[in-house]
Amino acid sequence: MEKPEWSELPGDLINLTANRFSSISDVLRVRSICKPWRSAAATPKSFQCNLPSSNKMIETVLSPTTFFRVTGPSSCSYKGWLIRTKQVSESSKINLLSPFFRQLLTPSQQTLDLLKFEVSEIRQSYEIHIFDKYLIQGVIGKEGPSHILSRVVFLDNLIFAVGQDDKIWCCKSGEESSRIWTKIKNQVEDFLDIILHKGQVYALDLTGAIWWISLSPLSLLQFTPSIPMDYDGYDSCNKRLVEYCGDLCIIHQLRLKKAYIRRSQRTVGFKVYKMDEYVAKWVEVRSLGDKALIVARDSCFTVVASEYHGCLNNSIYFVDNVRKSVIRMKL
């Protein structure tokens, strides 16, 4: 039996193949092979953006973005670039964002041919934009969200977020869902961050303890003890969760006040801790090795530094609140 041409493969088989890819970039690659494949392979499904709310004057919108590693067509180059994209709707183009600021970059007439570049998905990140129509109507010219929740994770059809009250909230996504946002019970502490780690959801409280979120029943269970905090000489310590070398770790971003700028603080250092499960004790990570840590507003993750242009190992990249620029610090 003669082998059929790629363009003549059954449409059902092409669509079945495309549906096995979880990455949007992989599905787009399948669709870009030829016109018959583009017609047969379904457009990647996007998340249900509008989330249910009991208050008709308040609209909550899920805003997902995706981090990618892109390498050029040259086979001799193994280094790539870190990019961030956002697609507003299924029919819209994919927009390029600043990886750290989530801002839309200057539009370009050029397009990225996925057949000429290696594009690999790193991770997805989420924010929840809250539009309070009472507040928006009261401010002339205001069009953006009233509030932004930047500590958000997505697991199956469940969305978890650290709310404005520093508590963990949960909501079902999907058109068939009519549930409103629900606050998880038995919360004894306020929370700073939330993360999806090995298929489980964990949250970080103010004391530096990590809590595991049980889905059935929906509740919080303490997973680790608090981190001893002895930071004399610093004005504040911002804490974040990150996965490093398979371990769940806590980042401490140490800050000092700027005397000449009101309500402004500068970052003067970082500390990273991981739990030693054998002795049930927090230990400090002295070096990131060949890794670099990316600290964005809504996402923290590590990359292999040698795989990216201009990226140095054992480094932490973050945004300086005063200069509004990306800063690098050695751990």
From Swiss-Prot:
F-box domain ranges (all copies): 4-52
Organism: Arabidopsis thaliana
Short name of any one Pfam family annotated for the protein: Beta-prop_KIB1-4
Coiled-coil residue windows: none
Source taxon at top rank: Eukaryota
Taxon lineage: Eukaryota, Viridiplantae, Streptophyta, Embryophyta, Tracheophyta
Protein name in UniProt: F-box protein At2g26160
Classification via InterPro entries: KIB1-4_b-propeller, SCF_F-box_domain
